[in-house]
Amino acid sequence: MQEVRAKKALGQHFLTDENIARRIAGALSGGGDVLEVGCGTGMLTQFLLERTDITLYGAEVDGESIGFLHSRFPDFAPRLYDGDFLRMPLREMFPGGVKVIGNFPYNISSQIFFKILENRDLVPESVGMVQKEVAVRLAESPGSRDYGILSVLLQAWYDIEYLFTVHEHVFNPPPKVKSAVIRLRRNGTRALGCDEALFVRVVKAAFSQRRKMLKNPLKAVFGDFGGAEHPWFTRRAETLSVAEFVELTRWVEVHGTVR
């Protein structure tokens, strides 16, 4: 089989360490359908296929990788989708739900997590390798400079675990930064107790000017609130917990200009 060349435009850095691939595959709980995003050379795929407690599917956009994977895992070929995960109709393809795993392409890792969020009722769990700084940011707590939009949104519906750090030398080509593996598991939250679409808007607005007090970015998006002032308006977005953002969303719904 011809070797697959990593393509910079696709954000590809192929994992070469079998022990790490085995750890990633083992970090996912058993049962149900599993979708691997970006199968690459099949380093992780081989250990997922060894698991008899899951049904593995794959998503890959690189034609060279797809040809390689078809040759290496012919029985897996019918479940390997030639297409972009970000465009996949998960609700149609996996109406019973699907877990998501992968060595996520670094250039779209944040978009992958937003896709998971949009399908949170379908995705009970995800294990992904991303840039270390992204993993830290997602798992961060309020009060940290790394705490941001995805931190709040993911933590609203998922418990996030930083599992382990992965060094540069176990990839081909080696990335310029360290990587990390994180695990997302749906928490007990089924409804936030506020307008969830508005919650997302409030969080994004609050962090749009993260170094300023909340009143500035929120008034820019939702108007002057009829002159009303929330007691948290003097705080910054990075200091609010998920529960506080939920409460703030309820307040904005009552006092703001919501379109």
Regions found by a protein language model. Name each.
Residues 205-259:
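C-terminal lobe and adjacent flexible extensions of AdoMet/dcAdoMet transferase-like proteins
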Residues 1-205, 243-259:
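Catalytic cores of RNA-modifying enzymes
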